[in-house]
Amino acid sequence: MSKNSKAYREAAEKVDKTKLYSPLEAAKLAKETSSKKQDATVEVAIRLGVDPRKADQMVRGTVNLPHGTGKTARVAVFAVGDKAEQAAAAGADIVGSDDLIEQIQGGMLDFDAAIATPDQMAKVGRIARILGPRGLMPNPKTGTVTADVAKAVSDIKGGKINFRVDKQANLHIVIGKASFDEKKLAENYGAALDEILRAKPSASKGRYLKKIVVSTTTGPGIPVDPQVTRNFAEA
């Protein structure tokens, strides 16, 4: 839905920009204002009160969305031998080592998450400049550098997603599809906010959650009250 289209303008008129909506209200309105031509993705955009340029104010982590994202993630695993077999058995879409690295260097990035066994990280470091900016670099803090590749693959396939603040102190998380029931969207939202609050750096002073907007890929932004994370009865 183009922002210049009549349908988008009509959808935007349904949003009261002077109001801060509850998570459930925002989820319901996101569904109502989304294009009916496709099952749009529902995303949360958060402006954080941190300075990402400082190492002690980096915000990153993982969240297991109780209802998933509505999309089965494609997972790449850097592993060899038994670990490679375990990853494949768990449902990994791409498994390899030097061969996988060469494919990525050649431009192949057809996956949503990457996992590596610890012994592969020295090799994976060669493509850090490719994976890092895309949020695909395996990291022990997010559970994607691990010997238990089967569990890591299962977690990601089951709805576990990573989040990381960008250079402008913004953070984006997908919480589902417009076809989801609004309560499921709100519950995914609550789970995501819980983890983001848990990841608050001790060095962050003042207001941590500065601004929150929920939107679909085809609809207008809906401002959400940062003080309300799990009051699902408000709708």
From Swiss-Prot:
UniProt-listed PANTHER family: 54S RIBOSOMAL PROTEIN L1, MITOCHONDRIAL (PTHR36427), LARGE RIBOSOMAL SUBUNIT PROTEIN UL1M (PTHR36427:SF3)
- The protein's superkingdom reads Bacteria
Q: Which GO terms describe its cellular component?
A: large ribosomal subunit
GO MF assignments = rRNA binding; structural constituent of ribosome; tRNA binding
Q: Which organism is it from?
A: Mycobacterium sp. (strain KMS)
Q: What does this protein do?
A: Binds directly to 23S rRNA. The L1 stalk is quite mobile in the ribosome, and is involved in E site tRNA release.
Recorded hits in Gene3D superfamilies, A to Z, give: 3.30.190.20, 3.40.50.790
Protein name according to UniProt: Large ribosomal subunit protein uL1
